[in-house]
């Protein structure tokens, strides 16, 4: 049975499988640094011990090997142990040269890395990003399950825009036109009418936005919740505690490994500050900006707010003009909505939704949209739709912001942006 490198120190005999990360040859001995997902270990291959020594002697870096041998607990290697091999099976020999180095100090440009992602992801500093992402998602799921949320999966091929915009990818659906879904928003709300009361979804979302920035993707993983008999304050509380639980799960399980790679994760101590959109505008104008009510925040304005609040903070009561048609109004100008920010970066957006049919139809019209395009959605509001609220987080952007990474493509396994459709 295969053993993992992390367990070798507790064993006397092992069978390890992994990649030959580095190779040194000295006459009748080959020293191999073998790597698997749990770590690295030195394997010493001697000509008198291994039948296919000549074949092993010629292997290239990143060849895939299966090694059987004894554990030398008195080794002078860096780890204090090494494997004295009695057999080495070459499972797959790597070609040379590699398209991208794994242990080389030379940094390749991002396009080269993404074009050879299967090599790029072998590096510890890249693997840890996705271990962190997986752990964050585990913490989010665990907390929402504990609160009694039901995980659901909604359609990703739809007949009309979720939010009424033009940023949709068209697809041919047999004889009809369809689109890749921007968001599960409308389906989450329909499930509130179905009596599910508390749902969450983790799934792909698609935006045909032409922005080509460090923060934009055209396909991303969206984490959405919707909750009945709740307002925007209720789901802000859920969001705050969800993020706290995710961060604690991350630190408890990967804290040392993250610190080793220079990732320092923000903690949430006490309540997250909440400021209104008007308060944010007033502060920015007192700092030299010239913003009017209804203006969105420029990157520079967001940076100034981030310098003031340092870590996490909510911006609440956004203008009606800046929110989708399903957002509940607080008054004629503002909505019961919020964004969660980490310094200058948006983490999450949410709101209380309109739950009365006539109000929703009027708001759809006020946004310049046709209610007939939303018949399947609107019908759910005619037969007992409860008050409800929710939010959505982009997993890749959450990972980027928490780890302090500058480009969201680095927190996406195989990014899809304005110019990239491969690999």
UniProtKB/Swiss-Prot annotation:
Homodimer. CDD domains: AsxRS_core (cd00776). It comes from Picrophilus torridus (strain ATCC 700027 / DSM 9790 / JCM 10055 / NBRC 100828 / KAW 2/3). Its EC number is 6.1.1.12. Residues 185-188 are annotated as: Aspartate. One of its GO terms (cellular component) is aminoacyl-tRNA synthetase multienzyme complex. Mg(2+) 3 binds at residue 346. Mg(2+) 2 binds at residues 346, 349. It is found in: Cytoplasm. Binds 3 Mg(2+) cations per subunit. The strongest magnesium site (Mg1) is bound to the beta- and gamma-phosphates of ATP and four water molecules complete its coordination sphere. L-aspartate binds at residues 163, 207, 349, 353. GO terms for biological process: aspartyl-tRNA aminoacylation. InterPro entries: Aa-tRNA-synt_II, aa-tRNA-synth_II, aa-tRNA-synth_II/BPL/LPL, Asp-tRNA_synthase_2, Asp/Asn-tRNA-synth_IIb, NA-bd_OB-fold, NA-bd_OB_tRNA. This is Aspartate--tRNA(Asp) ligase. The record marks 78 as: Important for tRNA discrimination. It catalyses: tRNA(Asp) + L-aspartate + ATP = L-aspartyl-tRNA(Asp) + AMP + diphosphate. SUPFAM superfamilies: Class II aaRS and biotin synthetases, Nucleic acid-binding proteins. ATP binds at residues 207-209, 215-217, 346, 394-397. Catalyzes the attachment of L-aspartate to tRNA(Asp) in a two-step reaction: L-aspartate is first activated by ATP to form Asp-AMP and then transferred to the acceptor end of tRNA(Asp). Its cofactor is Mg(2+). The keyword Oxidoreductase does not apply. Its main location: cytoplasm. Keywords: Aminoacyl-tRNA synthetase, ATP-binding, Cytoplasm, Ligase, Magnesium, Metal-binding, Nucleotide-binding, Protein biosynthesis. Belongs to the class-II aminoacyl-tRNA synthetase family. Type 2 subfamily. The lineage of its organism: Archaea, Methanobacteriati, Thermoplasmatota, Thermoplasmata, Thermoplasmatales. The keyword Ligase applies. It comes from the Archaea. One of its GO terms (molecular function) is RNA binding.
